[in-house]
Amino acid sequence: MHIPFLDLNKINLRFEEEFLQATQQIIRNGFFVLGEQVHTFESDLAEYIGCEHVIGVANGLDALTLIFRGYKELGLLQDGDEVIVPANTYIASILAITENGLTPRLIDPCPNTFNLDLIEENISEKTKAILH
């Protein structure tokens, strides 16, 4: 018996025409990076969430890398600081941490719930952030 986990075709079908039109517009105008669509997205999202600035990035790794870099620029994190992450995290989490000169500390999740029940007992003087 097949039980579908996530039927993206069904979910996206109602948006198909809009997706196709947007894709064609991007291809036609030739701006794949920093084009009008990115500017519109950033402006619309900033207004929607009620903040002054939004930066569109290519993926989650870029987003996490910029977040950690921002914390370092603000003096909230320094080279060598420890960041606790679940051991079963996606590699982008580790790459963003190490790219910024920080040290990942991998914590095994609870095998029954996948929660990080062991976080508290693994926090040390070097721990400055938890990415979960």
Question: Predicted segment positions?
Answer:
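N-terminal "arm"/small-domain region of PLP-dependent enzymes with the aminotransferase-like
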Residues: 1-31, 36
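Short beta-strand segments
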Residues: 5-7, 58, 131
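An acidic, carboxylate-rich microenvironment
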Residues: 10, 40, 62, 115-120
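Solvent-exposed, non-membrane alpha-helical residues enriched in polar/charged side chains
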Residues: 20-24, 42-46, 68-69, 120, ...
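Phosphate-binding glycine-rich loop
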Residues: 31, 35-82, 96-100, 106
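PLP-dependent aminotransferase-like
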Residues: 73-132
